């Protein structure tokens, strides 16, 4: 990344990939204009949008930097954005989420206060078209946190308290509980190798990190974030801010939604296998756990594929059982779907739709 001109310390570059985001972008950008951190560069990568995204971006003039490219998907758009960044700190964000006003200031303070931390993320609230879905939603969204006996504290061993003076928006009254936040930090590599719990739109890191781990790999597809985060966690500490710093939008268009499940589950399996190949020593040291991971990911991919291609689903399920020894309720459910005639499955789905209508 040494070929890019870098601004003096203090500038934070926020990188936002955007594809057909004309409806959500204005609120996303407005949330960044309201940040308590004063020195911000907003980079929006228009990833071949076919709606009015370009016109929306043009209306902001020089308040934002726009980079346009043919549609290349999330890995390409993220990589293009971080390559264009001039700030010493880089924050990731999606085109349909909202930053809380203190987000950038809080995360910058974490990276300034603990120099061994290479990546800072945070908890987040979730919302949809109907309103708030959940507060402090990370433990619900990420199984790694939800299953852990002490939540994030089970994954990151050090617990710190950090003062927020100067980070919060001006207010006549600030509750004592809001003056500080808990920050968990530590070596997250082993935990992340088994499944990501770092929410990509909440990430901030130092620009120099890109020289060590590179950018986002297109071969990882929709799971490029997990692949990249695992590489990051292998070289330094991860910090998790307990205070939610992002409002995360849940919608049918995002990659984590049911309509994209086939691609997401296939990409998850591919990245899990890649992580195992990349660190054979860790794979062998934790072989039973990795076998369970891969067996589940195969079965989950089979479940996603079964309505589309039963032969492919059968191959994935066979691999889950024969190669990884995974036999559980999911295995039996997928097997039943494979053996059930397509017309019977369609009739069952129709009855379910009528019942829920």
Residue ranges and their predicted role:
Residues 12-24, 28, 35-36, 45:
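A conserved hydrophobic helix/loop-capping motif in glycosyltransferases and polysaccharide synthases
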Residues 23-26, 51-59, 98, 102:
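Acidic helix N-cap motif at the loop->helix transition within catalytic regions
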Residues 31, 38, 46-55, 94:
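A conserved acidic beta->alpha catalytic loop
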Residues 69-85, 106, 137, 187:
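Glycine-rich, basic loop-to-helix element that forms the pyrophosphate-binding segment
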Residues 83, 122, 146-264:
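Conserved nucleotide-sugar donor-binding catalytic segment
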Residues 90:
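Short aromatic/hydrophobic "clamp" motif used to bind/position activated sugar donors
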Residues 102-166:
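Conserved donor NDP-sugar-binding/catalytic core segment of glycosyltransferases
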Residues 141-151, 244-252, 257-284, 307-325:
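Catalytic core of nucleotide-sugar-dependent glycosyltransferases
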């Amino acid at each position: 990344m040494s070929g890019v001109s870098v601004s003096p310390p203090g500038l934070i570059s926020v990188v936002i990939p955007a594809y057909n985001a004309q409806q959500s972008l204005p609120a996303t950008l407005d949330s960044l204009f309201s940040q308590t951190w004063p020195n911000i560069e907003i980079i929006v990568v228009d990833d071949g949008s076919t709606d009015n995204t370009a016109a929306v971006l043009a209306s902001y003039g020089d308040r934002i930097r726009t980079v346009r490219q043919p549609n290349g998907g999330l890995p390409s758009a993220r990589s293009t954005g971080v390559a264009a960044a001039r700030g010493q700190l880089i924050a990731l964000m999606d085109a349909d989420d909202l930053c809380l006003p203190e987000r950038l200031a809080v995360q910058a303070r974490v990276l300034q206060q603990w120099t061994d931390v290479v990546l800072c993320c945070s908890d987040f609230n979730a919302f949809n078209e109907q309103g708030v879905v959940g507060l402090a939603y990370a433990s619900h969204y990420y199984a790694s946190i939800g299953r852990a006996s002490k939540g994030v504290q089970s994954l990151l061993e050090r617990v710190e308290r950090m003062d927020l003076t100067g980070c919060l928006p001006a207010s006549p009254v600030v509750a004592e509980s809001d003056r500080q936040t808990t920050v968990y930090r530590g070596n997250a590599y082993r935990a992340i190798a088994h499944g990501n719990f770092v929410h990509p739109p909440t990430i901030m890191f130092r620009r120099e990190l890109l020289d060590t781990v590179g950018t986002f790999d297109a071969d990882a597809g929709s799971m490029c974030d997990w692949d990249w985060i695992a590489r990051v966690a292998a070289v330094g500490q991860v910090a998790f801010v307990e205070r939610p710093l992002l409002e995360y939008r849940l919608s049918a268009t995002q990659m984590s939604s049911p309509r994209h499940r086939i691609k997401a589950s296939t990409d998850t399996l591919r990245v899990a296998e890649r992580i195992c190949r990349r660190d054979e020593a860790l794979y062998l040291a934790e072989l039973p756990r990795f076998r369970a991971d891969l067996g589940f990911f195969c079965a989950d991919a089979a479940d996603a594929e079964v309505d589309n291609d039963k032969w492919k689903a059968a191959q994935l399920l066979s691999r889950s059982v024969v190669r990884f020894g995974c036999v559980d309720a999911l295995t039996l459910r997928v097997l039943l779907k494979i053996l059930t005639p397509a017309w019977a499955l369609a009739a069952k789905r129709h009855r379910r739709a009528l019942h829920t209508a």
